[in-house]
Amino acid sequence: ISEYPLYEIGKKVGSIFQDPKSQFFASITEDEIAFGCENYGVPYEELDGRVSSAIKRINGDMLRGKEIYPMSSGEKQKIAVASVNAVDPEIYVFDEPSANLDMYSVEALKNLMGGLKAEGHTIIVAEHRLYYLTDLADRFLYMENGSIKEEWTAGELLSIPEEKRRAIGIRAADLHHIEVDIPPTKEKDMTMEVKDLAFSYRKHPVFHDISFRAYAGDLIAIVGHNGIGKTTLSNILCGMQKEKEGQVIYNGTKVSKGKRKNFAYFVMQNTDCQLFGDSVEEELLLNGKGSTQEQRDDLLKLYGLFEWKERHPATLSGGQKQRLALAVSDWIDTPVLILDEPTSGLDFKNMMRISEHLKALAQKGKTILIIT
């Protein structure tokens, strides 16, 4: 492939980024799907057919004519896949494609990959979630420090001893044998109450009649299909969007949109939107004035970021950015912490690191809501 100029590689290899938004050039779905073909000079009379075929490939008729920005991450990923499919490359490269998808969408992604494979396309997937690939992938390549260390078939992957799997940081490839410990319920103080919450986007209802209570030490999962309004709900709880109807109550008092940031901190799915420092350490300094060097170093070590302290946040991997945003949330220290897909882009070791830390925060009385 090194023998080809870059513009020729783009015709042969199509990439779907971990953050699809970073590869978009248009604001409307059909325009984005057509963009690559237009740049390669595909005749206009052929272009419409390619766009329609790509939309059909992702079962995306409902996304026709829509603005891309307000879409969910799963919907944005579908548009990214369609834009690559319209160019019709020989090779597809997916970077963490399942990180932001619900189980239903992961199954749809798997079927899409299977269809492309059946047509003779080569599929390369950089992924931490493995369970949906075990009956699809021909080979699994394990990389460490920039080189391929091991190669397995699906059967060999599934037979890796649990101890070795954990040691090398690979997530479980079989979800049917994962043990879950459910701690006993204890009496707690109520931190937050949501009453009859409703929201609409440009007169289109997103959700209505949302009511629930959260208590100190609770760790609550907010689940549902992509595009159902989970992130919008979190934005409202943190004061980044305003509800159409309903109330958000913290510690027994109704709190206006502008003051909710004092009670709840939101770690976004796309952490690029909330990282502003010129280095990892400066990101902590922006949010933790008065902290000591030792405190900052200890926090960076806790999140496995100490060796990257001088790096610019933009140069970090998706998982490292997510851990940095979580470290910042420690400085802010609001009663409620909301996380949007906190384990997306993380390997097993760092996923467990985050899991243990969130459990420790809950044990100290923090209320934690996780979108997943």
Predicted regions and their residues:
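Conserved ABC ATPase "signature" region
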Residues: E46-L63, Q293-W308
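Helix-to-loop junction immediately C-terminal to a conserved catalytic motif
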Residues: C238
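The feature captures the beta-strand-to-loop junction immediately N-terminal to the Walker
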Residues: V223-H225
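Conserved ABC ATPase signature
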Residues: E67-M71, E75, H312-L316, Q320
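H-loop/switch region of ABC-family ATPase nucleotide-binding domains
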Residues: E127-H128, T372
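Catalytic Walker B motif of ABC-type/P-loop ATPase nucleotide-binding domains
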Residues: Y92-D95, L337-D340
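Conserved ABC transporter NBD signature motif
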Residues: I1-E3, I9, G246-R260
